[in-house]
Amino acid sequence: MNYNNKKTLKDIDVKNKTVLVRVDFNVPIQNGVITDDNRIIAAFPTINYLLENDAKIVLFSHLSRIKSKEDKLKKSLAPVAKRLEELLNKQVKFINQTRGQELEKAISSLQSKEIILVENTRFEDVLDDQVVKYESKNNSELGKYWASLGEVFVNDAFGTAHRAHASNVGIASNIKVSAIGFLVEKELKMLFQAVNEPKKPFIAILGGAKVSDKIGVIENLLPKVDKLLIGGGMSYTFLKALGKTIGKSLLEEDKIDLAKHYLEIGKDKIVVPVDTACAKEFADVSPTIFEGNIPDEWDGLDAGPKTIELFKQEIKKAKTIVWNGPVGVFEFKNFENGTKSVCQAIAEQTQNGAFTLIGGGDSASAAINMGFKDKFSWISTGGGASLEFMEGKELLGISAIQDK
């Protein structure tokens, strides 16, 4: 999909306008403390542009999932407002409501260059202890109500770009002027370049737990790539399809035939592990390496040294690299070697001029936690959204934005 025709922030007038901005502040919080503020910082180009251009800014974001009254007590955006204030060095008025007089009054008295952060949009998923999902099912009245609070809507939340929620599609469909923010614009540009206009050789590295999560990506990318490297939990279903024994490694029994089909149509392209780092239990213990077959009682938890070498050789040839999903249980120190080595090899190839993109989710957090934050061309902020883009699917949150 190409979204080049969508209005961007620079196409619209924001001076003295009340601008509703959907950001993605869905950050990890432990005991009231934000442990990773990358998503907050990612929204700064848009927020700073709006401040410089005299906008009145109203920020909307979700935080986690809300399924009960108890969740609401634990998942307020209050700590995010505090952190945002510290990072911007500017007052952020937090309104602990998602609708009502207090919110309306605060917005109507907002001055240029002032910022309001509205409470977690997903609080609208539970009302009076009833699960109603007004936000996540895009309740039409809620979308209209939020849209009525502003004059302009900017969607800068790539993390929910594939969802039709009241706070993105709902507002965009009910407001006169809408545009995408700088983060979303950059995400779309980078993904389009990687998936639709790749310099050859083009390789994709797919990992993560399940084949079923990556079917759409495999089907969209297999005709385009020169090589498809398969690692992580999903690789054991492919190894089983090749007739290997996989011990008690992760297996999707009902996807073996599909894996066989992919191996047949992509026989010159698909690269699977040749050895595996295993353990007898799912624990951070010293690994045992098996080549070829994995014996009974053993669980494959990472790529083995020969597989890592094989992957590195392919990465060294590439001019475009897309990576989605870790190649091992990187949360265990003893089984992080595959994912870390892939990170290192991609980082080196980026320095050699390759265009490299890491899909969001686990591979992005692995890369960032391992110290590779600035070593790739782009690390996506949206796991599900980048995956759906790679599948060639429409991103509903972007489609709802006005064309130029």
Swiss-Prot record:
It catalyses: (2R)-3-phosphoglycerate + ATP = (2R)-3-phospho-glyceroyl phosphate + ADP. Its EC number is 2.7.2.3. It comes from the Bacteria. Its main location: cytoplasm. Gene3D superfamilies: Phosphoglycerate kinase, N-terminal domain (3.40.50.1260). It is found in: Cytoplasm. Keywords: ATP-binding, Cytoplasm, Glycolysis, Kinase, Nucleotide-binding, Transferase. GO terms for biological process: gluconeogenesis; glycolytic process. It is an enzyme of class 2 (transferase). Substrate binds at D24, F25, N26, R39, H62, L63, S64, R65, R122, R163. CDD domains: Phosphoglycerate_kinase. Pathway: Carbohydrate degradation; glycolysis; pyruvate from D-glyceraldehyde 3-phosphate: step 2/5. One of its GO terms (cellular component) is cytosol. The keyword ATP-binding applies. ATP binds at K214, G300, E331, G360, G361, D362, S363. GO terms for molecular function: ADP binding; ATP binding; phosphoglycerate kinase activity. Belongs to the phosphoglycerate kinase family. Monomer. This is Phosphoglycerate kinase. The gene is pgk.
